[in-house]
A protein has these predicted regions:
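Acidic, low-complexity/disordered tracts enriched in E/D and polar residues
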Residues: 1-58
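Conserved alpha-helical substructure of the radical SAM core
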Residues: 79-226, 231
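Short acidic, hydrophobic short linear motifs in intrinsically disordered regions
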Residues: 61-75
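Detector for the c-type heme attachment site
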Residues: 139-145, 275, 432-433, 446
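Radical SAM/AdoMet-radical enzyme domain recognition
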Residues: 158, 162-178, 187-311
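C-terminal accessory region of radical SAM enzymes
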Residues: 327-361, 391-438
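Cysteine-cluster motifs in flexible loop/terminal segments that predominantly coordinate metals
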Residues: 418, 422-469
Length: 489
């Protein structure tokens, strides 16, 4: 990452995109910083005002035109001379020659090969319980039933699912298994049996199983905590934040709030978890567009690994987010970024899932183009052993891929998911964030547009805002590591 000298400017946010043929630059101002992203190289630059303006003109004007324009714009600044501007233009040219600015799109041709790739299955989401002990109003799974019958997965089905994953994972060693619901702990004995079976055969097949457990917390006890801390690579704990927010939509079957029941259990869970992976995951709705207050509330409860997701629901639901909510939500993401940096400075950091971005590495280009791998590398398994592209398609009969006994038989649907990538969506052609979102969530696209290759526009805008904030946080952290004088939260 190249960091130039800074000149601070008044608070504000502006952004624009330079798209010229096969090159793409995204420029924006956030938290007092000028940020420039070169989309195809992934290079991120924090620059001063002059460099920011020069980059904006660089591809559409001559050197002389840029100099004249900058001299006019900065006429009241004696430090901005013709020589200074010329030197800045030369710096930009050097970055271009180094492949860190104005790089070409070299990846589109890779997308055409995706459908032909021989992929292996890397992960299964086991629907261990199609039933739940909560009655959350916004539940996409229809209170755990997935618009069908209540059911619990048997050990025999779970055992076969593990065998199916091994058989279809090729030479891949690390395999992911998520225990999902409904509420998985309503079938905890079978969870334990499945894990024990997988552990008993993983060495024989040169596999390493990494289990994740998602729970609403109602049935968490010492046995669950001990088991999860021994066997689960990650746990996901569902909590929406403040008591009044959480209890409004996450009620027990008797219509009472669940906050007071689960929070002490989650606190004990996290306390005993040590340095093992977890995160507390919430959902925000139209009812709590001030969702940062929920994040900070959870942090003050002692939870440091946090995620807060926008609700996925029908647009006419009373808690559905609206287009008019977006400016409020954008501001919330900025508030979150600033507060995270402030808390880090105070020695009480928190991690926000959507701000976890690696400026120096990150996913391979295939993953950045194709996304989560739903329907090809990742599948959901129902209590009866049916296969679906992911948990959000379970119960949609048209998306049934096959089952764990006969394998994938609906090749047409699988091919449709295999061809889902960022280049398959014409709406993504001019989007600066496309190599970070990988085209977005197929399920969200389907539920919003009726097509897995559609675009959920409001979701796109939220993602772009989160990414701008994530990049800003990452840049400031990087500057602090290098003791840069302008690394001020």
């Amino acid at each position: 990452m190249i960091i130039k000298d800074y000149r601070r400017f008044p608070k504000g946010l502006t952004a624009f995109l330079l798209s010229n043929g096969d090159i793409m630059i995204h420029q924006y101002k956030l938290n007092g910083y000028n940020i420039v992203l070169d989309v195809y190289s992934g290079s991120v630059h924090a620059v001063d005002d002059l460099a920011y303006d020069v980059i904006a003109m660089y591809k559409n004007a001559t050197k002389e035109q840029i100099i004249d324009e900058m001299l006019s714009k900065y006429a009241d600044n004696p430090e901005i001379t013709k020589e200074e501007i010329s030197e800045c233009i030369d710096d930009v040219k050097e970055l271009e020659e180094q492949g860190k600015l104005f790089t070409d799109d070299k990846y589109e041709n890779l997308a055409f090969d995706f459908k032909k790739r021989n992929t292996v299955i890397k992960a299964l989401c086991l629907h261990i319980a199609h039933t739940c002990n909560l009655n959350c109003e916004y539940c996409f799974a229809s209170q755990g039933k997935y618009h069908g019958e209540r059911a619990l997965m048997s050990f025999e089905v779970g055992k076969r699912a593990i065998d199916f994953l091994i058989e279809n994972s090729g030479s891949r060693v690390n395999l992911e298994v998520d225990f999902f619901g409904g509420e998985p702990l309503m079938n905890f004995d079978v969870v334990k049996q499945i894990v024990a079976y997988a552990r008993s055969i993983e060495k024989e097949h040169n596999k390493n199983f990494r289990f994740t457990l998602t729970t609403n917390g109602m049935l968490v006890d010492d046995d669950v905590i001990e088991f999860a801390n021994k066997e689960c690579h990650n746990v996901v704990l569902s909590l929406d934040g403040r008591k009044e927010v959480h209890d409004h939509l996450r009620k027990t079957v008797n219509g009472k709030g669940s906050y007071d029941i689960i929070v002490p259990k989650f606190q004990e869970f996290v306390k005993k978890r040590g340095n093992k992976g977890y995160y507390v995951r919430g959902t925000y709705t139209h009812n709590n567009t001030d969702f940062t207050n929920d994040i900070f509330h959870m942090a003050d409860l002692g939870f440091t690994e946090l995620s807060m997701e926008p609700v996925v629901c029908a647009p006419d639901d009373p808690y559905a987010l609206t287009y008019d909510d977006l400016p409020i939500l954008f501001e919330q993401y900025e508030i979150l970024a600033k507060e995270m940096l402030k808390r880090e400075k105070e020695g009480r950091p928190l991690t926000f899932y959507h701000y976890m971005i690696d400026l120096k590495g990150g996913p391979c280009i295939y993953k950045r183009i194709s996304g989560c791998g739903s329907g090809t590398e990742y599948m959901a398994v129902t209590p009866w052993g049916d296969l679906y592209p992911c948990h959000q398609f379970v119960g949609e009969e048209a998306f049934k891929l096959g089952d764990i006994y006969t394998g994938v038989t609906n090749k047409k649907i699988q091919d449709e998911f295999a061809s889902c990538n960022v280049y398959a969506r014409k709406e993504c052609a001019d989007c600066w964030a496309r190599l970070y979102c990988s085209g977005g969530c197929a399920a969200n696209a389907y539920h919003a547009t009726g097509s897995v290759k559609g675009v959920y526009k409001e979701g796109c805008e939220l993602f772009c805002k989160r990414l701008e904030c994530a990049l800003a946080v990452a840049i400031i952290r990087d500057m602090k590591e290098k003791n840069h004088e302008d690394a001020d939260c």
